[in-house]
A protein has these predicted regions:
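Extended, charged catalytic domains and RNA/DNA-binding interfaces, predominantly
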Residues: 1-176
Length: 176
């Protein structure tokens, strides 16, 4: 069950400290961190300072964020359950009209001189992914959803050999 007392930066930093001491380090990328934004520059649940703290705490674990939102087919769906009162659907399921996607990417990624540029300018090895998760395809005649098939809309290419470890190493090194 969801426990809002655990959804804090302190809890995240404790988890990162634990994860950072595992024998095999996993990869962690923030999942659509500006989907909760209320305006351009008003980030919502995930603040830039938190992303910096998490990266500082575990730079070999916390590697970046999904900068291209999922649910890219939201504007194409015929499923009325995903539309607002005006009959509109929002790209990437970024539902606040004051904080839309920008060219298919969220504001933390898309704004020149913005957050991602700042992170790179600070010398951080902080990467952007374009996810291809797919829950329900927008053209499904029975259960139309908000998604394209994996890889149908956007992809993250990794310079890697065709093995799991090589792909993970490429993601860690930013060869994407």
């Amino acid at each position: 069950p969801e426990d809002p007392t655990r959804n804090t930066s302190t809890s995240a930093l404790k988890a990162l400290a634990f994860i950072n001491n595992l024998p095999r380090l996993p990869l962690l990328f923030a999942n659509h961190p500006s989907r909760s934004a209320t305006a351009i520059g008003a980030y919502g649940l995930d603040e830039p300072s938190e992303l910096r703290h998490y990266h500082d705490a575990a730079p070999n674990v916390y590697h970046g964020m999904e900068g291209a939102p999922g649910h890219q087919a939201a504007t194409l769906t015929t499923n009325e359950n995903f539309r607002n009162d005006a009959g509109d659907s929002h790209r990437g399921y970024y539902t606040n009209p004051d904080a839309p996607t920008l060219g298919g990417f969220d504001q933390m990624t898309a704004i020149v001189g913005g957050l991602w540029d700042s992170l790179l300018g600070e010398g951080r090895r902080f990467w952007i992914l374009a996810s291809s998760d797919s829950h329900m395809h927008y053209a499904d005649p029975v259960r139309p959803g908000l998604d394209f098939w994996p890889g149908e809309f956007h992809k993250t290419y990794a310079w890697a050999m065709p093995t799991y470890n090589s792909v993970l190493d490429s993601l860690r090194a930013g060869r994407i």
